[in-house]
Amino acid sequence: MTSAAAIPTVILNDDNTMPVIGLGVGELSDAEAEQSVLAALEAGYRLIDTAAAYGNEAAVGRAIAKSGVPRGELFVTTKLATDDLGFQSSQDALRASLERLGLDYVDLYLIHWPAGSQGTYVDSWGGLMKLKELGLTRSIGVSNFHAQHLDDIIGLSFFTPAVNQIELHPLLNQAELRAVNAEHGIVTEAYSPLGVGSLLSNPAVTAIADAQDRTPAQVLIRWSLQLGNVVISRSSSPERIKSNLDVFDFELTADQMAALDGLDEGTRFRPDPETYTGS
């Protein structure tokens, strides 16, 4: 089993460090989120990813408190909901998130979606810059931002996000956006790495899993890690949570990586950031 000390980290463009693998709690109930976070922290995870829009920040906070893991060992991410976009409202929203989480600061605060007008998410970015200055978040970043969205906030603020969290799996490998992120020194963080489960039975994935004597989920997570991404996966099963962390003692071959790269067809299981207006 992988221990917390054995999980590699990446240095962000603001010199903070971030574990390369974590647990996400999107779409989990309070009870599921609390159980999953407790199981993850016990298994060795230290990156926990939630969001105001998930409605389970308080449950995540309870699990963190119950775990006994020192705050300094954790990397906690939450996200700004679309309803709270704006310079001042983004600041008020993080303070409310911190109260629900029972924390004095988060390690990473993300704009969840580039919804609304350009001015709205650019103003929100200014709010996040202020929150970083105040020490309420150590790092700031974005989620679901495309190249033009990134150009907007960087060009108008002269401050580059540390992280861009995006849907990413072999059916949507995001090669162009990953390259844009890299050009800016932005870490790509992959969510939905299993294609919301649809890839677990894909013949190319299962063939590699058989060859490596690994689970399909481990193969998919390992593929994303070898691309240089930070990866967050979601599960409410303690057994799968443990298994999904056990990905640091094997490597996919160049041919296996190429086979998974070749599955790309632009398939999204989550909303398209170009058209999404929700939270």
From Swiss-Prot:
Binding positions (NADPH): 194, 196, 232, 234-235, 240, 243-244, 270
Keywords recorded for this protein, A-Z: NADP, Oxidoreductase
Alphabetical list of CDD domains matching this protein: AKR_AKR5H1
EC category name: oxidoreductase
Molecular function (Gene Ontology), one example: aldo-keto reductase (NADPH) activity
This enzyme's EC code(s): 1.1.1.-
Active-site positions on this chain: 54
Similarity remark: Belongs to the aldo/keto reductase family.
Name of the protein in question: Aldo-keto reductase Mvan_2161
